[in-house]
Amino acid sequence: MKIAIAGSGYVGLSLAVLLAQHHEVKVIDVIKDKVESINNRKSPIKDEAIEKYLVEKELNLEASLDPAHVYKDVEYAIIATPTNYDVDLNQFDTSSVEAAIKTCMEYNDTCTIVIKSTIPEGYTKEVREKFNTDRIIFSPEFLRESKALYDNLYPSRIVVGTDLDDSELTKRAWQFADLLKGGAIKEEVPILVVAFNEAEVAKLFSNTYLATRVRYFNEIDTYSEVKGLNPKTIIDIVCYDPRIGSYYNNPSFGYGGYCLPKDTKQLKASFRDVPENLITAVVQSNKTRKDYIAGAILAKQPSVVGIYRLIMKSDSDNFRSSAVKGVMERLDNYGKEIVIYEPTIECDTFMGYRVIKSLDEFKNISDIVVANRMNDDLRDIQEKLYTRDLFGRE
């Protein structure tokens, strides 16, 4: 089967590699370097499984800048373009999704278009009306950055939103779900073909629950530090309850990354006509955590604050909406000199702060080293290290 994918970020590229094991897949992107990288079998993003599969697997995969070449004759066109949160509109910016749909329809008037980008509730119906087509369905992704292909190979569930009253479209939705399952290694995978709105909002609720869990354990940590208690002991006791579990429970400077901040804000906006307290509290409490972390650092009265890594996860190369950036902004408001150690940054400054290339120099000039996640590189400076990482994992 011929499949097109718009976007080569962690969603689009992981799907491309997954499906190219058994199908002819063409990826379109507007960035020439990414296209060349994929065609040279080098991953433009950090993902160990993607890097391995590009080198070791026989993939029927091609990347291109040419939409006519990509969309012609395909049966499915997957839209995996970014939908950042627009604070002025108070919702996702879906312009890239609509641009991709428009381009696809110019070159192919028969394929089924699958939106993989995260979107607001009601958007699929809205965009079907806007483009006067019944060929668009929605399939939420449940992927982790830097582990996107792994999560496609071992999916927790496959969800497709469709018009359940349209038997042909529902058939196409099931077929798309089977395409994803066919590329997976995991054999027993729940498949749920549901209404558009249910699929859309389930994605937002899933990520907001994860954000809530992050905030819960961060509040245990804040309480413990203020009261002089051992947060690890308390978290261990809490998590021995199998209903809670010892996972996703490591304190941090707050939730961040590409998905959780924007998805929680979108869900909060979706609740505008629905009574709620929790969703608003989750969004607000993440700001409170950053305020607290910044205050704890300022209390140590450092002249030079060293920020060790901007990335949210130790195996990631992305620091969009990183929690530590929020802490930096708060410290900057108090006039603190801030230096950064971040090997993924090639320039000498970032956000107006000096980037130190030498780890030894960084340690020497910093009065305090702030690390969202612990690393063995920092074991020799425990006396000036500030981290809330208790377990040495995500």
From Swiss-Prot:
- Keywords for this protein: Capsule biogenesis/degradation, NAD, Oxidoreductase
Residues engaged in binding substrate: E141, F142, L143, R144, E145, K203, N207, Y248, N249, N250, P251, S252, G256, K313
One GO process term, biological-process aspect:
polysaccharide biosynthetic process
Gene3D superfamilies of this UniProt entry? N-(1-d-carboxylethyl)-l-norvaline Dehydrogenase, domain 2 (1.10.1040.10), NAD(P)-binding Rossmann-like Domain (3.40.50.720)
Question: Which catalytic residues are annotated?
Answer: C259
Q: Which GO terms describe its molecular function?
A: NAD binding; UDP-glucose 6-dehydrogenase activity
Quote the InterPro entries the UniProt record gives: 6-PGluconate_DH-like_C_sf, 6PGD_dom2, NAD(P)-bd_dom_sf, UDP-Glc/GDP-Man, UDP-Glc/GDP-Man_DH_C, UDP-Glc/GDP-Man_DH_C_sf, UDP-Glc/GDP-Man_DH_dimer, UDP-Glc/GDP-Man_DH_N
Q: Any keyword Thylakoid?
A: no
- The Enzyme Commission number assigned here is 1.1.1.22
- Pathway membership: Nucleotide-sugar biosynthesis; UDP-alpha-D-glucuronate biosynthesis; UDP-alpha-D-glucuronate from UDP-alpha-D-glucose: step 1/1
**What's this protein's function?**
Catalyzes the formation of UDP-glucuronic acid which is required for capsular hyaluronic acid synthesis. Directly responsible for the transformation of some unencapsulated serotype-3 SP mutants to the encapsulated phenotype.
Family the entry assigns: Belongs to the UDP-glucose/GDP-mannose dehydrogenase family.
> What's the protein name?
UDP-glucose 6-dehydrogenase
Q: Which organism is it from?
A: Streptococcus pneumoniae
